[in-house]
Amino acid sequence: MRTGIGIDVHPFAEGRKLVIGGVEIPSAKGLDGHSDADVLLHAVSDALLGAAALGDIGLHFPNTSQEFKDIDSMILLKHVKKLLDKEGFRIVNIDAMLLLEAPKIASYINEMRKNIARCLGLELNAVSVKATTNEKLGYIGREEGAAAHAVCLIQVKP
């Protein structure tokens, strides 16, 4: 068994869609980044890559490459799954936490879980997504950005 942790942060920007966990959420601002800036999927991807000792998303999907400009992060997560499969790993579970002040996303969490589970070939009960605010503290509290943390457990396939 191996564990991995992933953390990602993106600032908010005008004129961008807000996509978290593969779900487009109505918002005046979206997250800024080279890809679609899906902070949740980036943290999950980093956790999985770390658990398998395969580096991080910056190594596999550099923000200097036009190939990944505005790419759907679900495509990146699918590629991460293929890398783990190739190395002989099976994903046991994922636990993730979103940190953002606004918008409120509780009504979207189950859809995020379903998207991640479907993408990774997991049962829904193997994917946990939670959200919290930063109690108005720091850049998250000032609604300047959002962050996500993810932990995963993987094992070598029998």
Curated annotation (Swiss-Prot):
Binding-site residues, 4-CDP-2-C-methyl-D-erythritol 2-phosphate: D8, V9, H10, H34, S35, D56, I57, G58, T132, T133, N134, E135, R142
Keywords for the protein's UniProt record, in alphabetical order: Isoprene biosynthesis, Lyase, Metal-binding
Reaction(s) catalysed (UniProt annotation): 4-CDP-2-C-methyl-D-erythritol 2-phosphate = 2-C-methyl-D-erythritol 2,4-cyclic diphosphate + CMP
Residues given in the record as a divalent metal cation binding sites: D8, H10, H42
Gene3D superfamilies: 2-C-methyl-D-erythritol 2,4-cyclodiphosphate synthase
GO biological process: isopentenyl diphosphate biosynthetic process, methylerythritol 4-phosphate pathway; terpenoid biosynthetic process
PANTHER family: 2-C-METHYL-D-ERYTHRITOL 2,4-CYCLODIPHOSPHATE SYNTHASE, CHLOROPLASTIC (PTHR43181:SF1)
Chain's role: Involved in the biosynthesis of isopentenyl diphosphate (IPP) and dimethylallyl diphosphate (DMAPP), two major building blocks of isoprenoid compounds. Catalyzes the conversion of 4-diphosphocytidyl-2-C-methyl-D-erythritol 2-phosphate (CDP-ME2P) to 2-C-methyl-D-erythritol 2,4-cyclodiphosphate (ME-CPP) with a corresponding release of cytidine 5-monophosphate (CMP).
Protein name: 2-C-methyl-D-erythritol 2,4-cyclodiphosphate synthase
Organism listed in the record: Chlorobium phaeobacteroides (strain DSM 266 / SMG 266 / 2430)
Lineage, top ranks: Bacteria, Pseudomonadati, Chlorobiota, Chlorobiia, Chlorobiales
